[in-house]
Amino acid sequence: MAAKEVLFGNDARVKMLAGVNILANAVKVTLGPKGRNVVLDKSFGSPMITKDGVSVAKEIELTDKFENMGAQMVKEVASKANDAAGDGTTTATVLAQAIVVEGLKAVAAGMNPMDLKRGIDKAVIAAVAELKLLSQECSDTKAIAQVGTISANSDESIGDIIATAMEKVGKEGVITVEEGQALENELDVVEGMQFDRGYLSPYFINKPETGSIELDSPFILLVDKKVSNIRELLPILEGLAKTGKPLLIVAEDVEGEALATLVVNNMRGIVKVAAVKAPGFGDRRKAMLQDVAILTGGTVIAEEIGLELEKATLEDLGTAKRVIITKDNTTIIDGSGDQVQISARVSQIKQQVEDSTSDYDKEKLQERMAKLAGGVAVIKVGAATEVEMKEKKARVEDALHATRAAVEEGVVAGGGVALVRVASKIKDVEVLNEDQKHGVVIALRAMEAPLRQIATNAGQEASVVANTVKNGEGNFGYNAGNDTYGDMLEMGILDPTKVTRSALQFAASIAGLMITTEAMIAEVPQDSAPDMGGMGGMGGMGGMM
């Protein structure tokens, strides 16, 4: 086992803080409408330019093991915020840094770290409850566009295109982001259905650059059982070979000999085929298979209704314009089902939603209804160069996550104002001692940090801006985009409640752990062994007499 180096007390905390500051300082320059870009070196291809906090955080690895531990813990804050809400990573990092800096000062002054942490936790619980009270519903297209615009670094075209996409496919519809070919952003809306089952074998992949399978005008075979014997599929495969069209098999499972034979046939180019598991489980799987059948104009081959796979013909198969399969998802685009039957199926599911008493069942039924009635919207990001394309695509994805979060939990005033208002309302949180009270104060100070950073990035004096906003009421705040003060909601500066809440909770969680750290252990770096020296040359023979 390699030797370890151990640091205690203040020595450990100083090193950890240095790492936190390096990472947070690199991330926080991107915050707000006047935040700057960060350039990331890539081992191949052109450098990546980004304004996305989590992308910057993920790139950072420090040489010093102890500093790196601090940096990695703050990286975790950004990653967690990104996973939960898809945005707010920079805000989370700024909050974490503010709590750690103030917390470690208090620990150095002799306060009890555990009580400080408890005080911070109490303040955060109160703040989250207060945020929910401040939150307003986000349902109209204008508000959705404003949220998207703010998240995409004040790019109105991105906010508008996301709002249009949501309007067309519904808030539950599937929206994907792709790299486009033009200079401008484009929106394609295609009727379709997506479900969370990927390919059963990577050998079906025909688009290695994206790791996906694309089938044009395929037949779709729907089977409500496991398929393991290839003989059952032979009649269908022989009929298909004559048409030259690809086949998608959706079954409970395809395994053993059947899967192996399909893979071999596909690789040899005899039949273009792909197989995926049917979505859902039990009765829900039967219902979802029926949904796919109605959407594609096919029939579900199920023994309980007297249909056998061996006797199936091409008439039993559904068809679609296109099918795209990744390792996680299958999207059926433009199924050729009868529109009247699709509408009837949607009405039937709507009735089931009204009759259902379980929230879980309602949610799943609404999901099915959205997939049948909605469609798939594809936002194609346009840019002049590949470097700009990557940067813009990341912003569009962030904005899409933010708008989904806004629809889910509502919106609050943006620009760091919501946290400032929350802080003013929770000053009197109940605590047990002075150290816990100071923990609450640390959390309240940290809640001003995002507003201060937005002002700093806009070239303003942070303290002046913070005091002006604190002296105001309600949604009064600072618009860094045009350097004015006013009502943030009226100016269209909104943040999703979920994003603000997640940022605060994850920042406080990890910062609290860092404040209570008393020792750090890391491996001692190994010096590489010196190379073996070359052998000395042999002396020459003496001259002969």
UniProtKB/Swiss-Prot annotation:
Its EC number is 5.6.1.7. Keywords: ATP-binding, Chaperone, Cytoplasm, Isomerase, Nucleotide-binding. GO terms for cellular component: cytoplasm. Gene3D superfamilies: GroEL (3.50.7.10), GroEL-like equatorial domain (1.10.560.10), TCP-1-like chaperonin intermediate domain (3.30.260.10). CDD domains: GroEL. It is found in: Cytoplasm. InterPro entries: Chaperonin_Cpn60_CS (IPR018370), Cpn60/GroEL (IPR001844), Cpn60/GroEL/TCP-1 (IPR002423), GroEL-like_apical_dom_sf (IPR027409), GROEL-like_equatorial_sf (IPR027413), TCP-1-like_intermed_sf (IPR027410). Pfam families: Cpn60_TCP1 (PF00118). One of its GO terms (biological process) is protein refolding. ATP binds at T30, L31, G32, P33, K51, D87, G88, T89, T90, T91, G415, D495. One of its GO terms (molecular function) is ATP binding. It is an enzyme of class 5 (isomerase). PROSITE patterns: CHAPERONINS_CPN60 (PS00296). The keyword Kinase does not apply. Together with its co-chaperonin GroES, plays an essential role in assisting protein folding. The GroEL-GroES system forms a nano-cage that allows encapsulation of the non-native substrate proteins and provides a physical environment optimized to promote and accelerate protein folding. Belongs to the chaperonin (HSP60) family. HAMAP family: CH60. Forms a cylinder of 14 subunits composed of two heptameric rings stacked back-to-back. Interacts with the co-chaperonin GroES. This is Chaperonin GroEL. It comes from Shewanella frigidimarina (strain NCIMB 400). The lineage of its organism: Bacteria, Pseudomonadati, Pseudomonadota, Gammaproteobacteria, Alteromonadales.
